């Protein structure tokens, strides 16, 4: 069978989606929009390479041998050509080009497109859906109905042969609608396969909600809440979210007494009804003496994933008069996100006081609360 490479184009600005960050880097059901497409192509048995055309926002993908990164161009066509140049395949190999802003790609659509390119008379294939809404055009003076007969909404991914699509795009003008148009302009025969609402391109803010409903796996999200308290004892720092914060005392506990991570561990365990931190790491067990609370947090994550749930986001609140948490807040967020493998914007850390009331007001210790949202694995 002919070798097939996927090219994911992720260089767009996505300004109409209504956020400061381009849509492909925003979160959808617990992971970045682009990660949905990456997973679909990496996991497909007929895809030998996945070329991702993106800037530094992509991050390190070196652990996945299928992935190659290419730099984006100034236009979409230039970005696609950059991806084609990075692919290490023959001229007659199949390429499947996909917009990163369409997270609903599925294995069946990929397979259908690849199958169409096995016919040597077919130069391009794409999914499309019939136009369901009434259409009108404005002549400048009045609105006129447009006949919908034969009209479709073309989506991605779109499949071609490497040599043909490279030549077609190189010859295309600046007003190219999509890659399929370039093949048609070059005289190639194209075929349409059945599209899906799941393949809708994220363009406007409301598209996120619509696709979240379509892509949500079976099962409801889970929410857990955790709370922890530790008193002060003689020492020179406290540990919160794995970050050592200088102080005139330390927190007393069997482990490292990281109240913030203990609360988050309980929140994760509670979300999947697996008891609390004391059930899994009892203070009576000497093996946990002085232990790094990151071990507890990672084990809670592992147990949740074993039950079919992944962490979508978490929110931690530290309650104390001292030390001042705000100067260390970003480091605490970063350390938690790194440990759990979450995007930074999926982790919130806040701090507050009790206005001098209670044991925290008397500076006798620190309390922490955490809330975690877990989603069924997609």
Swiss-Prot record:
<feature type="binding site">
    <location>
        <position position="362"/>
    </location>
    <ligand>
        <name>4-CDP-2-C-methyl-D-erythritol 2-phosphate</name>
    </ligand>
</feature>
<feature type="binding site">
    <location>
        <position position="228"/>
    </location>
    <ligand>
        <name>a divalent metal cation</name>
    </ligand>
</feature>
<dbReference type="Pfam" id="PF01128">
    <property type="entry name" value="IspD"/>
</dbReference>
<keyword id="KW-0548">Nucleotidyltransferase</keyword>
<dbReference type="InterPro" id="IPR034683">
    <property type="entry name" value="IspD/TarI"/>
</dbReference>
<feature type="site" description="Positions MEP for the nucleophilic attack">
    <location>
        <position position="201"/>
    </location>
</feature>
<keyword id="KW-0479">Metal-binding</keyword>
<comment type="pathway">
    <text>Isoprenoid biosynthesis; isopentenyl diphosphate biosynthesis via DXP pathway; isopentenyl diphosphate from 1-deoxy-D-xylulose 5-phosphate: step 2/6.</text>
</comment>
<feature type="binding site">
    <location>
        <position position="359"/>
    </location>
    <ligand>
        <name>4-CDP-2-C-methyl-D-erythritol 2-phosphate</name>
    </ligand>
</feature>
<feature type="region of interest" description="2-C-methyl-D-erythritol 4-phosphate cytidylyltransferase">
    <location>
        <begin position="1"/>
        <end position="222"/>
    </location>
</feature>
<dbReference type="InterPro" id="IPR026596">
    <property type="entry name" value="IspD/F"/>
</dbReference>
<feature type="site" description="Transition state stabilizer">
    <location>
        <position position="23"/>
    </location>
</feature>
<feature type="site" description="Transition state stabilizer">
    <location>
        <position position="254"/>
    </location>
</feature>
<feature type="binding site">
    <location>
        <position position="230"/>
    </location>
    <ligand>
        <name>a divalent metal cation</name>
    </ligand>
</feature>
<dbReference type="InterPro" id="IPR018294">
    <property type="entry name" value="ISPD_synthase_CS"/>
</dbReference>
<feature type="site" description="Positions MEP for the nucleophilic attack">
    <location>
        <position position="148"/>
    </location>
</feature>
<dbReference type="GO" id="GO:0016114">
    <property type="term" value="P:terpenoid biosynthetic process"/>
</dbReference>
<keyword id="KW-0414">Isoprene biosynthesis</keyword>
<feature type="binding site">
    <location>
        <begin position="254"/>
        <end position="255"/>
    </location>
    <ligand>
        <name>4-CDP-2-C-methyl-D-erythritol 2-phosphate</name>
    </ligand>
</feature>
<dbReference type="GO" id="GO:0046872">
    <property type="term" value="F:metal ion binding"/>
</dbReference>
<feature type="binding site">
    <location>
        <begin position="228"/>
        <end position="230"/>
    </location>
    <ligand>
        <name>4-CDP-2-C-methyl-D-erythritol 2-phosphate</name>
    </ligand>
</feature>
<keyword id="KW-0511">Multifunctional enzyme</keyword>
<comment type="function">
    <text>Bifunctional enzyme that catalyzes the formation of 4-diphosphocytidyl-2-C-methyl-D-erythritol from CTP and 2-C-methyl-D-erythritol 4-phosphate (MEP) (IspD), and catalyzes the conversion of 4-diphosphocytidyl-2-C-methyl-D-erythritol 2-phosphate (CDP-ME2P) to 2-C-methyl-D-erythritol 2,4-cyclodiphosphate (ME-CPP) with a corresponding release of cytidine 5-monophosphate (CMP) (IspF).</text>
</comment>
<keyword id="KW-0456">Lyase</keyword>
<feature type="region of interest" description="2-C-methyl-D-erythritol 2,4-cyclodiphosphate synthase">
    <location>
        <begin position="222"/>
        <end position="378"/>
    </location>
</feature>
<feature type="binding site">
    <location>
        <position position="262"/>
    </location>
    <ligand>
        <name>a divalent metal cation</name>
    </ligand>
</feature>
<comment type="pathway">
    <text>Isoprenoid biosynthesis; isopentenyl diphosphate biosynthesis via DXP pathway; isopentenyl diphosphate from 1-deoxy-D-xylulose 5-phosphate: step 4/6.</text>
</comment>
<dbReference type="InterPro" id="IPR029044">
    <property type="entry name" value="Nucleotide-diphossugar_trans"/>
</dbReference>
<feature type="site" description="Transition state stabilizer">
    <location>
        <position position="353"/>
    </location>
</feature>
<dbReference type="GO" id="GO:0050518">
    <property type="term" value="F:2-C-methyl-D-erythritol 4-phosphate cytidylyltransferase activity"/>
</dbReference>
<dbReference type="Pfam" id="PF02542">
    <property type="entry name" value="YgbB"/>
</dbReference>
<dbReference type="InterPro" id="IPR001228">
    <property type="entry name" value="IspD"/>
</dbReference>
<keyword id="KW-0808">Transferase</keyword>
<dbReference type="GO" id="GO:0008685">
    <property type="term" value="F:2-C-methyl-D-erythritol 2,4-cyclodiphosphate synthase activity"/>
</dbReference>
<dbReference type="InterPro" id="IPR036571">
    <property type="entry name" value="MECDP_synthase_sf"/>
</dbReference>
<feature type="binding site">
    <location>
        <begin position="276"/>
        <end position="278"/>
    </location>
    <ligand>
        <name>4-CDP-2-C-methyl-D-erythritol 2-phosphate</name>
    </ligand>
</feature>
<protein>
    <recommendedName>
        <fullName>Bifunctional enzyme IspD/IspF</fullName>
        <ecNumber>2.7.7.60</ecNumber>
        <ecNumber>4.6.1.12</ecNumber>
    </recommendedName>
</protein>
<feature type="site" description="Transition state stabilizer">
    <location>
        <position position="16"/>
    </location>
</feature>
<comment type="similarity">
    <text>In the C-terminal section; belongs to the IspF family.</text>
</comment>
<dbReference type="InterPro" id="IPR020555">
    <property type="entry name" value="MECDP_synthase_CS"/>
</dbReference>
<dbReference type="GO" id="GO:0019288">
    <property type="term" value="P:isopentenyl diphosphate biosynthetic process, methylerythritol 4-phosphate pathway"/>
</dbReference>
<comment type="similarity">
    <text>In the N-terminal section; belongs to the IspD/TarI cytidylyltransferase family. IspD subfamily.</text>
</comment>
